[in-house]
């Protein structure tokens, strides 16, 4: 009986230890190993196919700030803004000219973004709405000449007056013309100042301009970026080291940028190309990606737990930080040694990146210096509409949903050399903001659900079942040991009564019945057996 109880106890303890070790140590390691072998950019894998040609479009929203009092602003007044949008586009991402380097475990490719107007989702807007915005060539051009080539201001002012006759600081145009179809730039004049101005169009320095013929160009914010080269990347494939999956090694065939001063950390590539992330990240590491539009790597950091279609995930968020307060961001200042040259909190100076007086921020200056909001009318920053967020599953490296939001602003200032710009106020004027959003549908979430989470649920159920069974076994063994100890027979030893020879002492004692020694035999009788007593348990 004791052998069975001992076996039951040992087996139960073994099951308990197995459930703990397998459920919390061995199985997660096996699962991570299996994921690491599947999630690579090796040719022929499902991940490679999904990564190179995204099988679904992202949602791309554009919101434009219509200036309702342009004449007042031209005279130095406070801008009043009206947000118009969203104008909705389907954004398709693909990668072409892929070249693998097996030895370095990298793949090089050219990124391409294609925007297709989604008229149905844009309703009631049509894209033909007339909007008033700062002149997209005169204002940036005049400001940059004043800052960097003041000696050429007279020549530039004359050229602008010829190429854009009767131009004002603000222009009116249709949304699709401003952003995609383009606004006409007439470079047909033989005047020297006009030719000098137009030379930057012919040389390709104005990347937003498309040459139509020998003398005319079309300028738009996004037209040239549509279905065209968005940069040449080299990233890690993650075959040799899964932790480096998607990490940017080169951009434009360069191992680092040469944009920011002092060759500091700001020129380094940190993170992926934003279309893939390595599996098995720790939440404290953050999600980093290089963004060519900003010439910068941005990191999103853990905020809280979240869920998507019933699957647990982690919510990450980001902002542009405060270059003055954060020493690691000092290299984004014009002069890292002079903090007065740093952009305001929550903004980033894009001039070194785009060669124009542009400032990046979160929409409506969310999480930025409150003065920026106070300088204009019509802004209402809030987390729900304007924060950047990502709901991310760490083990598989899957972003379930995300909203990448960014606002572009004009770093406006008066320009003495151009009559139409002399009275402008000095402030940061919002132009437009965009949102690039993704929400995985059931087809792709089910791939994660039935490969990852189903296995995790089975493992969780199995380990708790084994733990419960081990507790039942331990309890049963304990009960059997207890029951056995409760029925033990204990034989009491006989009492020995010694006879004394001290007569004097005995005479002083009261009369007592005679005592006989327990081991003394009475003639003619047999000694009785010692009685057994069952000890009662108290």
UniProtKB/Swiss-Prot annotation:
InterPro entries: CD36_fam. Residues 1-7, 482-538 are cytoplasmic. Keywords: Cell membrane, Disulfide bond, Glycoprotein, Membrane, Olfaction, Receptor, Sensory transduction, Transmembrane, Transmembrane helix. It holds the Pfam family CD36. The chain crosses the membrane at residues 8-28, 461-481. Residues 29-460 are extracellular. Residues 501-538 are annotated as: Disordered. One of its GO terms (molecular function) is scavenger receptor activity. It is found in: Cell membrane. The keyword Transport does not apply. Glycans are attached at residues 66, 213, 226, 441. One of its GO terms (cellular component) is plasma membrane. Disulfide bonds join 266-331, 295-353, 333-342. It is a multi-pass membrane protein. GO terms for biological process: cell surface receptor signaling pathway; cellular response to pheromone; detection of chemical stimulus involved in sensory perception of smell; lipid homeostasis; pupariation. Plays an olfactory role that is not restricted to pheromone sensitivity. Belongs to the CD36 family. This is Sensory neuron membrane protein 1. It comes from Drosophila ananassae (Fruit fly). The gene is Snmp1.
């Amino acid at each position: 009986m004791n052998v069975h109880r001992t076996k039951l106890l040992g087996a139960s303890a073994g099951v308990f230890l197995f459930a703990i070790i397998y459920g919390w140590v061995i199985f997660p390691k096996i699962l991570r190993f299996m994921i690491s072998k599947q999630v690579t950019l090796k040719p022929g894998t499902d991940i490679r196919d999904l990564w190179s040609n995204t099988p679904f479009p992202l949602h791309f929203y554009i919101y434009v700030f219509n200036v309702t009092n342009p004449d007042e602003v031209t005279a130095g007044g406070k801008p009043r803004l009206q947000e118009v949008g969203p104008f909705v586009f389907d954004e398709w991402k693909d990668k072409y000219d892929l070249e693998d380097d097996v030895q370095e475990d990298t793949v090089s490719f050219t990124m391409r973004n294609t925007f297709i107007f989604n008229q149905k989702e844009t309703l009631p807007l049509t894209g033909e709405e007339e909007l008033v915005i700062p002149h997209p060539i005169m204002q940036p051009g005049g400001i940059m000449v004043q800052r960097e080539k003041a000696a050429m201001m007279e020549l530039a002012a004359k050229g602008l007056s010829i190429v854009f006759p009767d131009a004002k600081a603000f222009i009116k145009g249709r949304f699709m013309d401003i952003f995609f179809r383009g606004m006409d730039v007439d470079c047909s004049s033989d005047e020297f100042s006009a030719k000098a101005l137009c030379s930057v169009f012919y040389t390709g320095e104005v990347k937003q301009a498309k040459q139509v013929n020998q003398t005319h160009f079309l300028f738009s914010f996004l037209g040239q970026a549509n279905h065209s080269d968005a940069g040449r990347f080299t990233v890690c494939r993650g075959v040799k080291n899964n932790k480096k999956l998607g990490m940017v090694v080169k951009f434009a065939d360069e191992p680092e940028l040469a944009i920011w001063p002092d060759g500091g950390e700001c020129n380094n590539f940190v993170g992926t190309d934003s279309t893939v992330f390595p599996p098995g990240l720790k939440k404290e590491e953050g999600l980093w990606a290089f963004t060519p539009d900003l010439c910068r790597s941005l990191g999103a950091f853990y905020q809280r737990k979240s869920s998507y279609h019933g699957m647990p995930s982690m919510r990450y968020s980001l902002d542009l930080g405060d270059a003055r307060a954060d020493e690691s961001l000092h290299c984004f200042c014009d002069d890292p040694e002079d903090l007065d040259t740093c952009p305001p909190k929550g903004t980033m100076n894009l001039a070194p990146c785009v060669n124009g007086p542009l400032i990046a921020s979160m929409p409506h200056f969310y999480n930025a210096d409150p003065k920026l909001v106070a300088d204009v009318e019509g802004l209402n920053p809030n987390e729900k509409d304007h924060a950047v967020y990502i709901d991310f599953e760490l083990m598989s490296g899957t972003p379930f949903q995300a909203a990448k939001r960014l606002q572009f602003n004009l770093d406006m200032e008066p320009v003495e050399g151009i009559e139409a710009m002399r009275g402008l106020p000095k402030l940061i004027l919002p132009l437009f903001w965009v949102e690039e959003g993704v929400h995985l549908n059931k087809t792709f979430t089910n791939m994660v659900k039935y490969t990852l989470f189903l296995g995790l649920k089975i493992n969780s159920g199995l380990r708790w079942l084994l733990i419960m069974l081990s507790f039942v076994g331990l309890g049963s063994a304990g009960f059997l040991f207890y029951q056995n100890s409760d029925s033990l027979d204990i034989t009491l030893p006989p009492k020995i009564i010694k006879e004394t020879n001290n007569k004097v002492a005995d005479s002083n004692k009261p009369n007592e019945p005679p005592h006989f020694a327990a081991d003394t035999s009475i003639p003619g009788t047999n000694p009785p057996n010692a009685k057994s007593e069952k000890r009662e348990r108290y």
